[in-house]
Amino acid sequence: MERNQNPNRQPVELNRTSLYLGLLLIAVLGILFSSYFFN
């Protein structure tokens, strides 16, 4: 919505959020797969 105020800060935040979300998803998937394999 506000692209004129922080044009350089938005992409960095989006990249960081995407990276953190990816890491969280990988961690959750790893835990789920490990639980399934161990069971």
UniProtKB/Swiss-Prot annotation:
GO cellular component terms listed in the entry, alphabetical order: photosystem II reaction center; plasma membrane-derived thylakoid membrane
Keywords linked to the UniProt accession: Membrane, Photosynthesis, Photosystem II, Reaction center, Thylakoid, Transmembrane, Transmembrane helix
Stretch forming the signal peptide: none
Principal cellular location given in the protein's record: membrane
Membrane-protein topology: Single-pass membrane protein
Highest taxon of source: Bacteria
Subunit (UniProt): PSII is composed of 1 copy each of membrane proteins PsbA, PsbB, PsbC, PsbD, PsbE, PsbF, PsbH, PsbI, PsbJ, PsbK, PsbL, PsbM, PsbT, PsbX, PsbY, PsbZ, Psb30/Ycf12, peripheral proteins PsbO, CyanoQ (PsbQ), PsbU, PsbV and a large number of cofactors. It forms dimeric complexes.
NCBIfam families assigned to the protein according to its UniProt record, in alphabetical order: PRK00753.1
Function: One of the components of the core complex of photosystem II (PSII). PSII is a light-driven water:plastoquinone oxidoreductase that uses light energy to abstract electrons from H(2)O, generating O(2) and a proton gradient subsequently used for ATP formation. It consists of a core antenna complex that captures photons, and an electron transfer chain that converts photonic excitation into a charge separation. This subunit is found at the monomer-monomer interface and is required for correct PSII assembly and/or dimerization.
Protein name: Photosystem II reaction center protein L
Gene source species: Picosynechococcus sp. (strain ATCC 27264 / PCC 7002 / PR-6) (Agmenellum quadruplicatum)
